[in-house]
Amino acid sequence: MSASVQPVLKAESKNLNFYYGDFKALKGISLPVHDKRITALIGPSGCGKSTFLRCFNRMHDLYPGNRYDGEITLNPDGVNILSPKVDPIEVRMRISMVFQKPNPFPKSIFENVAYGLRVRGISKRSVLEEKVEEALTNAAIWNEVKDRLSDLAFNLSGGQQQRLCIARALAIDPEIMLFDEPTSALDPIATANIEELMAELKERFTILIVTHNMQQAARVSDFTAFLYLGEVVEFNDTKKIFTTPDNPRTEDYITGRFG
């Protein structure tokens, strides 16, 4: 990324707190998310990375006792997506998610990708076929599955299943894509394929990724946030975070002194 090009703000958390019942898991997190860039969230287990990520598409709404305090604004309209007046289904149409382990539906390859389109009210077969092909192509798996779209998704390899899940997320044309440790269950070759795919996707989408893999964060991201005990310790350009961090705790974590 050229230093002369100022990134555009796509979303922003503002003094975000999150509670699992009485437990305060996130503490006053204010963090920018830049448009068409990859932002990595790093930190030890239990630091709040995935909790923070799941705030962006209101996944916590699915469980009673969880509550938010603060805002996440989504541009260009500046809407606070955590507002109870905002439909979480609409949020999930704008912000899609790919999980740690591939989670294809017990349906055909075609229907896995078409699912979100049908939810959006698209039923015309020719439109579905066009958009499914586009999503599978953008997820770099079309050539591997184009002759077996009626096969069950479970018949695919782990790496193929994860790319199928990415295609499913892409099909609804989201503004932001969330990746929660998307390669932790994959072998090195499949991991490299997903990382290469993310580099291509950021040309059109804004990406937030949670990873425990420091090398992966350094390879794929433009910006990195280090979280610890529910707080942001440091946020900066990824190169600076990994070479000359401002906070000693960041350096200690990256170099393996704790974590």
From Swiss-Prot:
ATP binds at G43, P44, S45, G46, C47, G48, K49, S50. It is an enzyme of class 7 (translocase). Its EC number is 7.3.2.1. Keywords: ATP-binding, Cell inner membrane, Cell membrane, Membrane, Nucleotide-binding, Phosphate transport, Translocase, Transport. It is a peripheral membrane protein. GO terms for biological process: phosphate ion transmembrane transport. GO terms for molecular function: ATP binding; ATP hydrolysis activity; ATPase-coupled phosphate ion transmembrane transporter activity. It catalyses: phosphate(out) + ATP + H2O = ADP + 2 phosphate(in) + H(+). Residues 11-254 form the ABC transporter domain. Gene3D superfamilies: P-loop containing nucleotide triphosphate hydrolases. Pfam families: ABC_tran (PF00005). GO terms for cellular component: plasma membrane. Part of the ABC transporter complex PstSACB involved in phosphate import. Responsible for energy coupling to the transport system. Belongs to the ABC transporter superfamily. Phosphate importer (TC 3.A.1.7) family. NCBIfam families: 3a0107s01c2. This is Phosphate import ATP-binding protein PstB.
